[in-house]
Amino acid sequence: MSGRGKGGKGLGKGGAKRHRRVLRDNIQGITKPAIRRLARRGGVKRISGLIYEETRGVLKVFLENVIRDAVTYTEHARRKTVTAMDVVYALKRQGRTLYGFGG
């Protein structure tokens, strides 16, 4: 078992690393109509033009925090896949309990 710990799942011998695309500016994928729909769901009638970039910034920070915590839970459990429960626990840690996804 060559010292790989529990499971012994050695993923090959390393080999050449595949090139991973650098993801940047994906926050623009949160479109103006999508932000408008979220605001409508929250009961907003009129929306200032400056709101869209501000919303993208706030959403990015929020998601970075949740994902960082979820990945921490995943790494602690020595897994490589982030589960729904990791996200639920990350949200609970930040005081935003989410029901309906197990646990």
From Swiss-Prot:
- Amino acid composition bias (Gly residues), ranges on this chain: 1-14
Q: Which residues carry this modification: N6-acetyllysine?
A: 17
Primary localisation category = nucleus
Query: What Gene3D superfamilies does the record point to?
Result: Histone, subunit A (1.10.20.10)
Q: Where in this protein does the record say N-acetylserine is found?
A: 2
**Mind listing the GO molecular function terms for this protein?**
DNA binding; protein heterodimerization activity; structural constituent of chromatin
Q: Where is this region: Disordered?
A: 1-20
Subcellular location, in the record's words?
Answer: Nucleus; Chromosome
One Gene Ontology cellular component annotation held by this UniProt entry: nucleosome
Q: Which residues carry this modification: N6-methylated lysine?
A: 80
Q: What are the entry keywords?
A: Acetylation, Chromosome, DNA-binding, Methylation, Nucleosome core, Nucleus
Check the record and name the InterPro entries matching this protein: CENP-T/H4_C (IPR035425), Histone-fold (IPR009072), Histone_H4 (IPR001951), Histone_H4_CS (IPR019809)
Kindly indicate which segments of the sequence are annotated as binding DNA.
Answer: 17-21
- What CDD domains does UniProt report for this protein, alphabetically? HFD_H4
Name the protein family. Answer: Belongs to the histone H4 family.
Assembly with partners or alone: The nucleosome is a histone octamer containing two molecules each of H2A, H2B, H3 and H4 assembled in one H3-H4 heterotetramer and two H2A-H2B heterodimers. The octamer wraps approximately 147 bp of DNA.
Q: What does this protein do?
A: Core component of nucleosome. Nucleosomes wrap and compact DNA into chromatin, limiting DNA accessibility to the cellular machineries which require DNA as a template. Histones thereby play a central role in transcription regulation, DNA repair, DNA replication and chromosomal stability. DNA accessibility is regulated via a complex set of post-translational modifications of histones, also called histone code, and nucleosome remodeling.
- Entry protein name: Histone H4
